């Protein structure tokens, strides 16, 4: 076995300690994206107007739920469509933006045909322009990844948008550890569209958007960035004990 271990999350450290690993040999490194670029963009983008970012919605000022990532089966986006369909059953209360391409795109568009026709659902396709992705994320009110959530969580929180995903950590990616329930997002019961629907409604009704934006930035600025990762690596190679 290695002398030291770099781990993506605190949960991994807890599990390894339970299996007999020495805590001082386990360094939580977290994960990161292009933090410095995102930090510059976030200040520029949060002053935008929703009508300029979401011209494709009939009412762009409604709360916007976003998913960004590959449209694959493991993401279980059918659950998100079911939940938002239920929320909008009698009147349109929420917009849904899906950004990304993938094998499930045609199936999802077929499932969401009514939402597309009624102007509350939009498929933006794959987008590799980080400023455009930042516009979508920054002006959305909630990011939902109903299957597992990986770097999508870090991407969304980096632009001040809270994250929702399922609650079964045995079926999750490490980055789900960035979500602090009630602070910068929440969890719903795995594979339960009804619970997802209720949790989305409750969150959007009670959320203080500007406070949640600050909460979302906070965890990224503290841990999920290359500057913090460098301090962890330096502690490891110099023989210092882990911070976490």
Question: Residue locations for each model-derived region?
Answer:
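Donor nucleotide-sugar binding/catalytic pocket of nucleotide-sugar-dependent glycosyltransferases
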Residues: 1-52
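A structural motif in glycosyltransferase catalytic domains
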Residues: 65, 80-84, 96, 196, ...
């Amino acid at each position: 076995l290695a002398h030291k271990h770099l781990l993506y999350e605190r949960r991994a450290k807890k599990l390894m300690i339970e299996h007999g690993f020495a805590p001082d040999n386990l360094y939580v490194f977290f994960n990161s994206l292009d933090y410095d670029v995102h930090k510059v963009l976030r200040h520029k983008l949060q002053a935008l107007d929703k009508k300029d970012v979401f011209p494709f919605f009939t009412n762009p000022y409604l709360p916007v739920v976003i998913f960004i990532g590959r449209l694959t089966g493991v993401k279980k986006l059918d659950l998100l469509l079911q939940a938002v369909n239920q929320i909008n059953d009698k009147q349109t209360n929420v917009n849904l933006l899906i950004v990304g391409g993938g094998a499930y795109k045609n199936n999802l568009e077929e499932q969401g045909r009514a939402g597309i026709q009624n102007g509350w659902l939009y498929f933006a396709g794959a987008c590799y322009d980080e400023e455009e992705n930042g516009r979508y994320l920054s002006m959305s009110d909630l990011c939902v990844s109903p299957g597992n959530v990986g770097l999508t969580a870090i991407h969304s929180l980096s632009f001040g948008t809270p994250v929702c995903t399922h609650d079964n950590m045995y079926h999750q990616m490490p980055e789900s550890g960035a979500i602090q329930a009630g602070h910068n997002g929440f969890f719903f019961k795995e594979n339960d569209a009804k619970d997802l629907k209720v949790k989305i409604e409750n969150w959007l009704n009670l959320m203080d958007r500007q406070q949640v934006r600050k909460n979302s930035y906070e965890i990224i600025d503290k841990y999920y960035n290359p500057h913090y990762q460098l301090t962890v690596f330096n502690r490891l190679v110099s023989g210092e004990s882990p911070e976490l």
